[in-house]
């Protein structure tokens, strides 16, 4: 079943090349539970986008129970794509005040310009899989010392 977790009008850091977690989803700590990342979207939320390069990454924290998962400012509830579907057991968060400290290597990384939007989709057989008690983060970093306001989402598939 597909769910969307989104954030809207969040400011990036004003420090060049400083990655921060704008959005994250955590798999339940239940045996056999996992989800796939099916797509991400990131774009400028300002009325007049400027010519600003932005780095985007998707990363995983391997084991949230070991600590280092960070602290989200906003708790988010995944919204089902099927209005008659069940609720998700995934928990989400945005705009971390304490960054996760145990991210592994990026599963996806791309440079973009805020005058454009980024949409990345994965086929089910190619999608990154997040296993039990793992945290999947969508991180961004401005490439100049200027904070910008962005919005975005991730679509996840529980299975």
Annotated model-derived regions:
Residues 1-159:
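Beta-strand-centric surfaces of beta-sandwich/beta-rich domains
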């Amino acid at each position: 079943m597909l769910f969307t977790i989104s954030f809207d009008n969040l400011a990036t850091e004003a420090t060049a090349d400083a990655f921060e977690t704008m959005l994250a989803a955590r798999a339940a700590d239940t045996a056999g539970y996992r989800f796939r990342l099916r797509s991400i979207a990131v774009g400028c939320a300002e009325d007049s986008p400027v010519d600003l390069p932005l780095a985007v990454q998707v990363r995983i924290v391997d084991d949230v129970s070991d600590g280092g998962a960070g602290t989200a400012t906003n708790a988010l509830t995944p919204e089902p794509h099927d209005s008659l579907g069940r609720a998700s057991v995934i928990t989400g968060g945005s705009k971390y005040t304490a960054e996760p400290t145990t991210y592994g290597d990026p599963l996806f990384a791309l440079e973009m310009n805020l005058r454009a939007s980024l949409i990345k989709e994965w086929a089910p057989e190619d999608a990154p899989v997040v296993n039990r008690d793992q945290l999947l983060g969508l991180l961004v970093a401005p490439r100049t010392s200027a904070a910008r306001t962005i919005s975005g989402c991730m679509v996840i598939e529980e299975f």
